[in-house]
């Protein structure tokens, strides 16, 4: 009886917390953001690049998904947390094109989707403060297969404001 209650509790929590889930080809439920995204990426013809091309990259993709869940997704309603996360991401992307390796990965796609509402609300001046993450965001959004239904956000090509020293 305890097992049934635990299973029922699990499914209630999944529903309440809106945890992503899907049904695998074999009929099994796949639950959790990383699990669902990894499963779908495995089905892709581009799975090696999406999940990482070596063990270090695969671990890094997983770390970024955890960071996304712990930091990025939790700061949407808090201006100070949003600034902190954008500063961290901006510093990280200073000398990188993508979050992991030299090509687009699941980390880039998920972070893009998570940051889209934030970037949609930023002014040009705010976008310029986070120039490296803005450059990365603009690169990712121009892949229409990733952007899909989301609106294309406008980024200025020139500095419009004087940087504060």
Where are these regions (language model features)?
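Short, mixed-charge aromatic SLiMs
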Residues: 59-70, 133-147
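Poly-acidic low-complexity segments
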Residues: 14-15, 90, 131, 138, ...
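C-terminal helix/juxtamembrane-tail motif
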Residues: 145-165
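Short acidic/histidine-centered micro-motifs embedded in hydrophobic/aromatic stretches
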Residues: 39, 64-67, 112, 136, ...
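GST-like domain detector, emphasizing the conserved glutathione-binding G-site
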Residues: 1-99, 103, 116-121, 165
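Short alpha-helical linear motifs
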Residues: 84-86, 131, 154-160
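GST superfamily/GST-like fold recognition
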Residues: 99-122, 127-140
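Residue-level signal for alpha-helical context at structural boundaries
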Residues: 54, 79, 107, 127-128, ...
């Amino acid at each position: 009886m305890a097992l049934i209650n635990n299973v029922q509790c699990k499914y209630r929590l999944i529903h309440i917390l809106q945890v992503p889930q899907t049904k695998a080809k074999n009929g099994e439920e796949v639950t959790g953001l990383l699990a669902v995204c990894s499963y779908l990426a495995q089905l892709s013809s581009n799975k090696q690049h999406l999940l990482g091309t070596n063990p270090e990259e695969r671990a890094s993709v997983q770390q970024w998904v955890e960071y996304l869940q712990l930091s990025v997704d939790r700061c949407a309603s808090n201006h100070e947390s949003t600034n902190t996360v954008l500063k961290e991401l901006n510093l990280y992307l200073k000398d990188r094109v993508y979050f992991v390796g030299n090509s687009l990965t699941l980390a880039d796609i998920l972070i893009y989707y998570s940051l889209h509402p934030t970037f949609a609300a930023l002014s040009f001046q705010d976008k310029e403060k986070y120039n490296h993450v803005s450059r990365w965001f603009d690169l990712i959004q121009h892949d229409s297969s990733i952007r899909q239904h989301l609106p294309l956000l406008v980024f200025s090509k020139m500095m419009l404001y004087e940087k504060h020293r």
